[in-house]
């Protein structure tokens, strides 16, 4: 009997130790998971729709005060831009205090962030969307290759948008520029125009459409991102335009751009002329941009963002004549790529000026209430040739804007210009 009691004591003791070890392990796992979650969120941030905002109206003032202090302490460009942060605070603070609805707060904070005049400054407020972007030509907006969602709502290719919620397009774009984050006035105007199918607060929008001689009014529900399908394009596209001209579209600087480039580049690298297209490239990794640039330069040069990164021509670097197509959607890492290409002296730029912001070290910040924002933190600087890395779009050698006539007839104005230039028959624009 005594032996049995002793045995049970040993069993219970061992069981207790096992339970304790398991509890400690579980606690460690929970702590690790929590730490990892917080670490990941500190990098990526948390996005909120207007109806998900983790704030009550009585917290708006305190949260905005934190946002403003984060900006004052960390935003690296406001002095160069001539912004008086105290004056900016005095403009927004009473408006924030008067806000009683989440929609009011979201729009005011976004307006404040946009007032910082930086392309890489943003709030983490999600927009309702139709997963579509209009084609902007001068001050006119058109439907170009509509996605399934737009087609189901009655939109057709080449439709011209003339009004949003009854407001003429030019007026609507001007009124909404105050919410557009951009480093140049032209970029803010362009981003406002491109945002007609997105909204922080509206979930049903009316569009007046001109189709031939007909005028239509179409209603379009805007939905959460996870409720609409995005038509993704490849990172790199290559094609042979004719027996002497190759075409290479680089649509992102994010993975898998290098892998797709390695597959596509050899299919056009043997041709005497090559058109490289970054008009739809919104950026990604500047390191990838630097690697890609090495395929199009003919002598070593310093990377525009670094005093130590030397660009060396790749072993199989292109030996023919390179034309680089740029536009207002060329942004961030695509702009540092464009700047390196232009300053190489080996590449001819055609198209429209870029957005005007290579990045300036954007970082994410969070208030104690859980509201996230992103702002540039690196001091203003210039390339090794003296071009500002933020605040000025890169102007092509040949400024060639799109024309409505070419768009309506399915012609690419800028590619056609390059082809005529190669043939020696182009005229100045």
What are these regions (language model features)?
Residues 396-429:
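Low-complexity, Gly/Ser/Thr/Pro-rich intrinsically disordered linker/tail segments
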Residues 224-236, 384-387, 400, 404-409:
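Short, surface-exposed linear segments at secondary-structure transitions and domain or protein termini
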Residues 307, 350, 354-400:
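C-terminal regions of proteins
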Residues 201-366:
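Cleft-lining beta-strand/loop regions that shape enzyme active-site pockets
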Residues 108, 288, 295-296, 371-376:
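Long, folded non-catalytic interaction modules
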Residues 341, 386, 418:
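Hydrophobic, well-ordered secondary-structure elements that form the walls
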Residues 2-273, 280-282, 424-429:
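Flexible, low-complexity junctional segments that flank or bridge functional domains
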């Amino acid at each position: 009997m005594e032996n049995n009691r002793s045995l049970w004591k040993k069993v219970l003791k061992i069981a207790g130790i096992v339970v304790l070890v398991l509890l400690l392990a579980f606690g460690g796992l929970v702590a690790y998971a929590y730490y990892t979650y917080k670490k990941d969120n500190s990098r990526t941030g948390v996005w909120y729709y207007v109806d998900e905002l983790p704030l009550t109206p009585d917290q708006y003032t305190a949260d905005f005060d934190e946002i403003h202090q984060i900006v004052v302490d960390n935003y690296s460009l406001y002095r160069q831009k001539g912004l008086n942060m105290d004056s900016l605070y005095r403009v927004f603070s009473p408006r924030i205090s008067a806000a009683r609805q989440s929609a009011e707060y979201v729009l005011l904070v976004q307006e404040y962030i946009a007032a910082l005049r930086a392309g890489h400054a943003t709030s983490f407020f999600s927009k309702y969307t139709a997963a579509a972007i209009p084609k902007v030509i001068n001050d006119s907006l058109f439907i170009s290759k509509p996605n399934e969602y737009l087609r189901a709502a009655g939109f057709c290719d080449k439709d011209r948008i003339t009004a949003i919620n009854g407001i003429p397009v030019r007026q609507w774009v001007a009124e909404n520029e105050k919410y557009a984050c951009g480093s140049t006035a032209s970029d803010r105007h362009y981003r406002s125009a491109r945002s007609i199918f997105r909204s922080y607060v509206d979930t049903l929008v009316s569009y007046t459409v001109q189709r031939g001689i007909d005028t239509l009014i179409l209603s379009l529900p805007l939905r959460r991102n996870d409720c609409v399908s995005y038509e993704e394009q490849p990172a790199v596209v290559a094609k042979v335009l004719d027996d002497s001209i190759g075409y290479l579209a680089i649509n992102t600087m994010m993975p898998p751009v290098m892998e797709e480039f390695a597959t596509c580049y050899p299919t056009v690298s043997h041709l005497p002329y090559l058109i490289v297209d970054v008009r739809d490239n919104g950026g990604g990794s500047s390191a990838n941009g630097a690697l890609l640039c090495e395929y199009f330069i003919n002598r070593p040069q310093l990377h525009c963002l670094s005093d130590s990164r030397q660009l060396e021509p790749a072993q199989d670097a292109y030996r023919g004549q390179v034309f680089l197509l740029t536009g207002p959607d060329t942004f961030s890492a695509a702009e540092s790529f464009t700047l390196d290409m232009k300053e190489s002296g080996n590449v001819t730029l055609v198209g429209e000026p870029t957005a005007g912001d290579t990045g300036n070290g954007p970082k994410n910040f969070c208030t104690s209430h859980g509201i996230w924002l992103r702002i540039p933190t690196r001091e203003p600087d210039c390339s090794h040739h003296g071009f500002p890395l933020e605040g000025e779009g890169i102007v092509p050698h040949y400024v060639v804007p799109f024309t409505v006539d070419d768009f309506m007839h399915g012609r690419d104005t800028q590619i056609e210009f390059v082809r005529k230039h190669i043939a020696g028959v182009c005229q100045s624009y």
